[in-house]
Amino acid sequence: GQMPLHMRLPKLKGFKNPFKTEFQVVNLDKLAALYPEGGEVTVADLVAKGAVRKNSLVKVLGQGEISVALQVTVDAVSGSAKEKITAAGGTVTELV
């Protein structure tokens, strides 16, 4: 006879961590384009400008260069991004 459907379908393999934290990433080159004159960067500002979706964690990564002083207040910041922001005269505040 025909092989039953539940035996034809592949088994689920592996492990899914239910406590995994997913970040939406924003790189420095994107911040430089969104804030050409510098200023304060918050999660609400990034949502309003359409860079990230609301109700999720935001992490700033260090791809690209930045030359203006930014006051960044987001959930997480990578080490390279923190170095570049402070080198440009800005400040970093992490919420998590």
From Swiss-Prot:
Query: Cellular component terms, GO, for this chain's entry?
Result: cytosolic large ribosomal subunit
Q: Which GO terms describe its biological process?
A: translation
Does the record bear Ribosomal protein in its keywords?
A: yes
What SUPFAM superfamilies does this protein map onto?
Answer: Ribosomal proteins L15p and L18e
Locate the transmembrane regions by residue number: none
Residues of the signal sequence? Answer: none
| Any GO MF annotation of the entry | rRNA binding
Note the superkingdom of the native organism. Answer: Bacteria
Instruction: Give UniProt keywords alphabetically.
Output: Ribonucleoprotein, Ribosomal protein, RNA-binding, rRNA-binding
Family note: Belongs to the universal ribosomal protein uL15 family.
Query: What does the subunit comment say?
Result: Part of the 50S ribosomal subunit.
Provide the function of this protein. Binds to the 23S rRNA.
What name does this protein carry? Large ribosomal subunit protein uL15
* Native organism: Streptomyces scabiei
